């Protein structure tokens, strides 16, 4: 067990005085370092060796003054010698060491000075021997104290995940797979963290592997089984003749090591892979994202299919802050000067309960718990500042109230659920290390008696009250799977319909919508006292301090499509019916992934509850990658706009007397009826008579970028003429074959008309072409008048029978603002639609020759029309 910091400081002061006058390297260096390790309560003989033989970089034999494998290399010189040269000499030994034995620190000394090089951070610190007691925290890694600051995309997270991935692949290829492999890896993951963060002794697990298992790996599986059994057995119940290296391990409990596993048959290479994983400094690894990285490396395809997107901590904090942490931090500032109120606040935060119903590897729960513990840390500093300043030693076990057992998760995949469970324990321990640093006493919660509740199951098919009764819950959070309505598997769709099947238009919904609806129904159940709901009734007996808010507060990360286009009316119509109010939201931004092939998805965050919470906070972004700026809103509606709640359903007809809008012509041809410039040239050289059947073709890309493209427009072509154009006929035959092989019955029917586009809506008069998708960077979507001879592709919409005034209204800033507000998006690009954008737009009445109004009204209409036409002409 590590010494308290106060004890270490006392020992350091005595050590400095004892060695203040020593000068000769050879005479007393070994005694010096034995004493140095004793300062931190560690026996040098147990962890490090003197005069370690090694091949230097130049091929010559050398001897390392002191080596603690994988941790520390010491080079010692006589007083006054050059420490830069000592460091250079130390690094010259590196080529002769195994990779897993390479040190994380190099310490050089001349008795009077100690210079520590942190090789992973690149930092260097020099301490005078006489001042060692003032800087003992620099050497906390020796005693087992080590607090890390985690960084997004730290390469250490990637390396650690890849090393575990290598071990996973090697074992799976040998036939050890499935549930047993997943449990084994989670246990190994715990052991790796444990020996680098003070749960186990430093290098205890690695030394066991190196010293108590055969080099060829033949007995490694059996030895691990022995170790796992011991970790699940209290010390007093272990066999007295147990191998001392196993008996020395702490009792862990927590069900982590309870299940018996068939021993894996390791090879030499697999043993080396595990030892290589041991060589990482696991104290640097963030449990918040490691599990996600680990899972993605093991099975990237499965991860994509589940729609999971693992995220940076910065983005997770965008949800956690406005959901609960910002409010708790503000409350802490209000009460921190009042000891009684502060104690009550401490009890309040310890009682808060959280659920992530799509928790994956637990990253949202982990960071929520970490932030709550960080707040508790500040509370304890405020409560016990006088005692700490006076050097009084306090027992953190009596002071820490927050624990992982207030955190719940549901995860459909077994392996991520197991990782989430362990990640919560590891985060708890890492926060306990901060308490150690603050109070000077070791704080390790072993055996594990409390744990997060992570349920392996389908959240859309279960009653969440069976996981945690709504009466006990304060917050729901997470990022359910990002799967669009058209990308769902049959199972995804069945799960969605199990929740939303009664809603008209449920087929339009993205998968994430099911979690919104499920959460809204769940929090409503808390209020159903009149129906005899036990969860709701149970609330009556709770102390008001522990009841939290009357309503559970929820927040999900979601694809931005749930706040745009057709989905809004379907999803939010039901959400509003269930009494939900949005109290904070992040508008569209780029949600980055920490895993391989970093995925960026355009997302929103929506916070909602059944009570009307103020102030309402709306976070907007200048671009999807910029930092947000906050707006205090009077109301946040389902389009994430500061305006009254309104819902637009898809309309078949436009409002007002304006032309109908339609989709362009869909070839459904596999590209056989479309021609590039070069293909057109080649065809006309061979068959010049085909020229009368070739038309200019405009898809959205061609229209926006002025790119020439052509199509075969074979309406009314006589069969005899087609036979005289063999190259054209060959293309038509290819269309027929493609359509005949389609899985869609309607497409197979089109095989009877292979010379024609699959869907034809080409007008006979000039029309307005409207690209269906356009970049968000444009202030105006580029519409344009097009001659009827030019074929409009189905990546556009078209408005026939249009005049200049109607074109002017479509290009107006008012119409563009309408599109940006209610239209759908592809990522963050605009999506123009008939049913939502065009047909719901409140077109103004503009008098004209075809609709003359009487008297002054007619004259005013003509003036308006003239102004709009002039503006439209300027655009053209």
Name every feature range the model reports, one short phrase each.
Residues 22, 56-62, 83, 87-89, ...:
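Signature of N6-adenine DNA methyltransferases within the class I
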Residues 525-551, 847-869:
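Intrinsic disorder/low-complexity segments
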């Amino acid at each position: 067990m590590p010494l308290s910091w106060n004890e270490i400081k006392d020992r350091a002061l005595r050590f400095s005085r004892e060695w203040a006058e020593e000068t000769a390297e050879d005479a007393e260096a070994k005694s010096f370092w034995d004493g140095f390790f004793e300062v931190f309560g560690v026996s040098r003989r147990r962890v490090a060796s003197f005069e370690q033989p090694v091949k230097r970089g130049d091929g010559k034999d050398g001897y390392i003054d002191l080596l603690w494998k994988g941790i520390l290399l010491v080079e010692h010189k006589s007083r006054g010698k050059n420490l830069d040269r000592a460091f250079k000499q130390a690094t010259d030994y590196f080529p002769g060491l195994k990779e897993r034995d390479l040190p994380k620190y190099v310490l050089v000394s001349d008795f009077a000075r100690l210079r520590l090089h942190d090789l992973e951070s690149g930092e260097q610190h020099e301490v005078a021997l006489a001042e060692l007691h003032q800087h003992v925290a620099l050497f906390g890694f020796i005693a087992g104290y080590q607090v890390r600051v985690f960084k997004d995309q730290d390469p250490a997270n990637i390396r650690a995940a890849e090393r575990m991935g290598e071990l996973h692949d090697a074992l799976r290829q040998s036939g050890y797979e499935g549930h047993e492999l997943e449990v084994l890896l989670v246990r190994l993951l715990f052991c790796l963290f444990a020996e680098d963060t003070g749960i186990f002794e430093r290098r205890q697990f690695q030394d066991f592997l190196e010293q108590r298992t055969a080099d060829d790996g033949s007995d490694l599986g059996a030895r691990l089984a022995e170790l796992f059994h011991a970790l699940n057995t209290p010390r007093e119940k272990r066999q007295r003749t147990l191998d001392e290296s196993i008996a020395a391990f702490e009792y862990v409990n927590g069900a982590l090591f309870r299940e018996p596993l068939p021993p894996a048959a390791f090879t030499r290479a697999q043993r080396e892979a595990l030892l290589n994983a041991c060589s990482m400094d696991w104290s640097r690894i963030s449990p918040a994202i490691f599990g996600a990285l680990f899972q993605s490396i093991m099975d990237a395809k499965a991860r994509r299919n589940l729609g999971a997107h693992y995220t940076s901590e910065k983005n997770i904090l965008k949800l956690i802050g406005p959901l609960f942490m910002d409010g708790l931090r503000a409350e802490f500032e209000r009460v921190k000067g009042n000891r009684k109120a502060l104690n009550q606040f401490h009890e309040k935060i310890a009682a808060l309960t959280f659920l992530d119903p799509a928790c994956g590897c637990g990253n949202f729960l982990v960071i929520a718990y970490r932030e709550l513990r960080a707040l508790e840390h500040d509370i304890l500093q405020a409560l016990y500042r006088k005692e700490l300043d006076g050097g009084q030693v306090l027992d953190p076990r009596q002071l820490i109230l927050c624990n992982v057992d207030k955190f719940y998760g549901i995860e459909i995949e077994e392996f991520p659920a197991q990782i989430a469970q362990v990640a919560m324990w590891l985060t708890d321990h890492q926060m306990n290390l901060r308490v150690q640093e603050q109070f000077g006493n070791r704080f390790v919660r072993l055996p594990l008696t409390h744990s997060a509740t992570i349920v392996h199951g389908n959240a859309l098919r279960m009653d969440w009250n069976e996981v945690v009764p709504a009466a006990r819950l304060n917050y729901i959070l997470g990022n359910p799977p990002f799967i669009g309505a058209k990308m769902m598997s049959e199972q995804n769709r069945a799960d969605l319909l199990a929740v939303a099947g009664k809603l008209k238009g449920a087929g339009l919904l993205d998968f994430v919508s099911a979690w919104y609806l499920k959460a809204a129904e769940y929090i409503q159940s808390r209020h159903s006292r009149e129906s005899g709901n036990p969860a709701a009734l149970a609330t009556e007996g709770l102390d008001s301090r522990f009841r939290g808010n009357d309503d559970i507060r929820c927040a999900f990360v979601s694809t931005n499509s749930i706040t745009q286009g057709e989905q809004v009316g379907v999803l939010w119509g039901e959400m509003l019916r269930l009494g939900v109010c949005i109290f904070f939201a992040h508008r569209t931004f780029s949600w980055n992934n920490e895993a391989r092939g970093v995925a960026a998805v355009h997302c929103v965050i929506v916070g909602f509850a059944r009570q009307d919470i103020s102030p309402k906070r709306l976070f907007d972004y200048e671009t999807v990658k910029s930092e947000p700026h906050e707006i205090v809103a009077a109301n946040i509606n389902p389009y994430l706009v500061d305006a009254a709640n309104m819902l637009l359903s898809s309309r078949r007809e436009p409002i007002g007397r304006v032309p109908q809008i339609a989709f362009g012509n869909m070839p459904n041809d596999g590209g056989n009826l479309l021609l590039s410039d070069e293909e057109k040239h080649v065809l006309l050289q061979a068959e010049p008579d085909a020229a009368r059947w070739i038309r200019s073709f405009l898809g959205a890309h061609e229209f926006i970028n002025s790119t020439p493209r052509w199509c075969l427009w074979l309406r009314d072509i006589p069969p005899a003429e087609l036979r005289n154009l063999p190259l054209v006929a060959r293309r038509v035959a290819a269309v027929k074959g493609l359509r005949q092989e389609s899985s869609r019955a309607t497409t197979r029917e089109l095989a009877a008309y292979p010379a024609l586009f699959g869907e034809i809506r080409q007008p006979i008069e000039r029309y307005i072409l409207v690209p269906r998708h356009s970049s968000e960077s444009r202030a105006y979507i580029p519409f344009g008048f097009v001659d009827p001879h030019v074929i409009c592709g189905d990546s556009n919409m078209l408005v026939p029978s249009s005049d200049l005034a109607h074109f002017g209204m479509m290009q107006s800033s008012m119409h563009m603002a309408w599109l940006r507000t209610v239209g759908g998006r592809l990522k963050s690009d605009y999506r123009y639609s008939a049913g939502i954008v065009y047909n719901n737009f409140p077109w103004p009445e503009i008098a004209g020759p075809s609709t003359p109004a009487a008297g002054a009204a007619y004259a005013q209409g003509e003036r308006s029309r003239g102004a709009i036409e002039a503006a439209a002409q300027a655009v053209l």
